[in-house]
């Protein structure tokens, strides 16, 4: 898990990917990084 995901933030998917180093996505309230 990288960081919390907020559905109200339209840039959240990008922030999640960036936080994961380019490979991650929001799953519910969590940003999950793909190994």
Swiss-Prot record:
Q: Which UniProt keywords apply?
A: Chloride channel impairing toxin, Disulfide bond, Ion channel impairing toxin, Knottin, Secreted, Toxin, Voltage-gated chloride channel impairing toxin
Main localization, broad class: secreted
Could you cite one Gene Ontology molecular function of this protein?
Answer: chloride channel regulator activity
**Compartment list:** Secreted
Where does the source fall among the domains of life?
A: Eukaryota
Q: Where is the signal peptide?
A: none
- Cysteine pairs forming cystine bridges in this chain are 2-19, 5-26, 16-31, 20-33
A GO CC term attached to the entry: extracellular region
Q: Per the similarity annotation, which family is this?
A: Belongs to the short scorpion toxin superfamily. Chloride channel inhibitor family.
Q: What else is known?
A: The protein sequence was deduced by comparison to other short insectotoxin sequences.
Report the domain remarks. Answer: The presence of a 'disulfide through disulfide knot' structurally defines this protein as a knottin.
The job of this chain, per UniProt, is described as: Toxin with unknown function in healthy organisms. On glioma cells, interacts with chloride channels (probably ClC-3/CLCN3) and MMP2 at the surface of glioma cells. This complex is then internalized via caveolae, thus inhibiting the chloride channels necessary for cell shrinkage and tumor propagation.
- According to UniProt, the name of this protein is Insectotoxin-I4
Q: Which organism is it from?
A: Mesobuthus eupeus (Lesser Asian scorpion)
């Amino acid at each position: 898990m990288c960081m919390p995901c907020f559905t109200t933030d339209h840039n959240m998917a990008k922030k999640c990917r960036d936080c994961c180093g380019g490979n991650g996505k929001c799953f519910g309230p969590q940003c999950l990084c793909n190994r």
